[in-house]
Amino acid sequence: MRRHLTAVRTIAALAFCTWIVDTHGAQTPSRPGTVAPEIMIGKTISEIDCAAAVVGTSIPASVIKEPVAGVTLNPPRWNASTDTAPAHCVIDGAIAPVDQSGGAKAINFRVMLPASWMARAVQLGGGGMNGTIPNLAGGPDGQLLRRGFATYGSDSGHQNGPGFSPGPTDWATNDEAIKNLGYMQLKKTHDAAMAVIERAYRQRPRFSYFVGTSQGGREGLTVAQRYPDDYDGVAANVPIVNFSTLMLAPELIRIQEKPLANWVTRAKVNAIRGEFMHQCDALDGLADGVINNYMACRARFDVSEDANRNPWSGKRCPNNVDPNPADTSAAACLTDGQIATLKLVYSRYRFATPLANGVRTFGMWLPNTDPSGSGLIVDSRFKGQEGAADEASMHGHLGVLGVTGFLMGNPRANPLDYVEGGSFENRRHELSEWLDSTNPDLSRFASRRGKLIVAIGTDDTLASPGAQLDYYQSVLDRMGRGKVDEFARLFVIPQVGHGLRGNNYSVDGEGRTIPVGPIPSVFDRVQLLIDWVERGITPGKSVIVTAGDKSMPMCSYPAFPRYAGGSFSCAER
């Protein structure tokens, strides 16, 4: 079959290092340190190239550098250009597990090859517990296919049911399937996709990226830690860093709330966030309904180093008796039991023994304006709680299968039977090795000039901002700030949630009712990463983010937006 591969040239802005990729895949670097026009020579394919005769029907298992039984490819299909995506070729495939017992599932993956390719590839991460192939056309990251990326991703080796239903749960007790979710599927999918890309374009990508959010953010950190030779740049939003403990954390709260006296009800939400605002809003220099100085606020409410300290003393009910448990106002009081629960939620949780990479604590949550979010507060009594009816429902949440299946080995188990340091301790350590992206040594990734951009929000109640901050601090402690600043940024956006969106609170720290508006948080993380990787344009420690006609500096940890002289600028403590 006659191949239709032609060169496409684009000349972009000045860069520090120029690479020329010709039609034979040769790479010619400009002299390092010089400034020259960036010249990217890509390739095109047409519908005639989108065929099994070109990309094949299988990939040898030896090509995949994690254990697999084989890789099969479905017949490619060509999608013509539309308003939402350029013309591209789609190849679906399946990576067979080594374990054929039934619990381990095939990893279903997809590769999208744009008609006009700029020698870039990006692996897109998943979300939640995975189970579906992510949207590969571009989504919120600016239509990646239009930017000349070949895109690829997988379901990580298990399959959800219709809609958001979890599907079969037998995979949750299979070690190969769990390790696939944790890390192996990333390498397996990468290696299979590279084989497809090379067959289609007759060369491998010049630049290789990983972009992910939430579970995908954790996966981004994972590839930088485990497979640093495969990627030039990683963008990881709101990563679920300590995944094994994040799944357990809601159960730790429910275990704390088994005694009815410890139950924090939804009626207390306004009192909780009102106290956060009262103590923390003005720590950045301005009472405006936004807690910008997140680290100082965290220090006030984290009692892990001094359990006798009580940041909630001003909210304690007189004589430990709540005169009106149904009071939903900011003036509502808290009992000693409720205060004990809040101390748990907003302090570092200490493990019985250190987990993978010597991690001794889980950061839990930061003071926020959504204290009932993501199951931190539940509305009804649950099975196992004092006074709950026998028919009360078992507490459940997005990651509960990771507790009952991964940890306890029985998806029907009661997660509230967990005891820290108890009979599941060895399994806890094993899962931490497979699932937690906590290795602070990124020296191999850095030595290859890899670039890492992480963005988090302090109002996140799905992922743990505390764990995210503690991980990045461990990288700084291990490698030194000067070295880390050469290749990584952790951008922290105060008071935005898991989707990096949020508003100021309607009552400021001085008790005044104020207008509510969006917090600036919009920025193009992919372009920021491309500029750093391909053009040597290092992002500043402060990047302007927007929301409509509003703008703010987005600060790189450990800086925060401080108000002085009529405006905000990034400052450190």
Segments predicted by a language model, with ranges:
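Short beta-strand/loop motif that positions the catalytic acidic residue
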Residues: 454-456
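Bacterial N-terminal signal peptides
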Residues: 9-22
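Catalytic-loop region of hydrolases
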Residues: 26-120, 133-139, 287-291, 300-412, ...
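Cap/lid segment of the alpha/beta-hydrolase catalytic domain
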Residues: 128-202, 248-249, 410-434, 496-516
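N-terminal cap/lid subdomain of alpha/beta-hydrolase-fold enzymes
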Residues: 96-179, 183-187, 214, 225, ...
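Alpha/beta-hydrolase fold nucleophile elbow
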Residues: 203-214
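Short glycine-enriched nucleophile-adjacent loop
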Residues: 217-228
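Conserved alpha/beta-hydrolase "acid-adjacent" motif
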Residues: 462-466
